[in-house]
Amino acid sequence: MLVTYRYKLRLRSGQYARMAQLCEMQRQLYNAALEERIGAWSRARHSVTRLDQQKSLTEIRQADPEGHGSLPVNMGRWTLKRVEDAMTGFFSRVKRGQKAGFPRFKGRHRWSSFGMLEVSGMQLRGQFLILKGMDRAIRLNMHRPLPADAKIKGATFTLHGRHWFVSLQVESTEIVAAEAPTGPAIGLDVGVEHLATWSDGAVDGHIPNVRPRSRREHELRCAQRALARCRRGSRRRAKVRERLARLHRAIGNARDTHLHQQAERLARSHKLIVIERLQVRNMVRSAAGTVAEPGTNVRAKSGLNRSILDASMAKFLQYLRYKAERAGSAVLEVRAAGTSQLCSGCGTKVPKSLSVRRHSCACGLELQRDVNAARVILLRGLPAEGVQPLGQPNVADHGVRAAGTLLAA
């Protein structure tokens, strides 16, 4: 299994300048490679491939032994792969009819990382990382050890504010748990009031939404207003921008810590977790409309969009998937349509707006809205694990089977 371990670098005073120099060299290489592709196509309608540019990189390294020639060749190849990925993504978006977004040249403030596709030219010895091109070994803040059988497949160095971090791509068999969890299967409904609500049909629970951005909204607004008043290029603007960046990092760290902890707890406690197949990008679309057809309730929808993004539902489900794989449990996705409108007791559709927080059905079932949705999600996922039990309420929208026949999920 491939997993990424992220560590903070404890650099010496002279190593900060060298890391910045390496990052700048890779930025210039990226811009040169992109310019070569654009120029070759505009002049002769010739497509330059990644292999062509890797051959050119060999010539550059031979002509510049003190610069690119002193660095691991995989570092330059990592940068060329980023150019290839940018062009591939552009053509893919064009074919799908989406907004193309042609790759653009990277300025100093739009490039903050470099990496290596392979580990040749880099060694990890205890808490020290030996990197070709650095005069001294780099000390890592190893807050957690790597698995004993870990094989490093790649590395990415990233600058966040004033600090450098390294992300090591590791392959290991010790990461996956030997025994799967034995807890009951649950359905999981994510939302804004609670980050997630789960239910196994008998026991229910909530995961709180900590709302890290909302808690520091006043600080963010003050910093953004101060930045808007600064003159571009001034020292004061640089200081305010750094203050704003630190604030955003603190918010992101608080959010990620909460998401990691809650996803880990669920993955280690339940053998099956059934979730909705959400399209968060569609959920946070603007309601402003156009000049000809202006939208309605624009301010309310904008506030809801901020709350959805602050909760980071998609990131939480992403963490849950890979943590479940490590814990030996399973995550199953089901359709999200109608989960909050159907009754988990009888399968009847009970329409309700977002302001209605209680589910009340004519069959006599009364539940908190999110708990009912979690139970519907669970019932939709159980047939995929086997067959639909006879007499089970048809909340999963499957075809109704006759007695004595089997219905595949």
Locations of regions flagged by a protein language model:
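Acidic carboxylate diad motif detector
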Residues: 51-158, 289, 306, 310
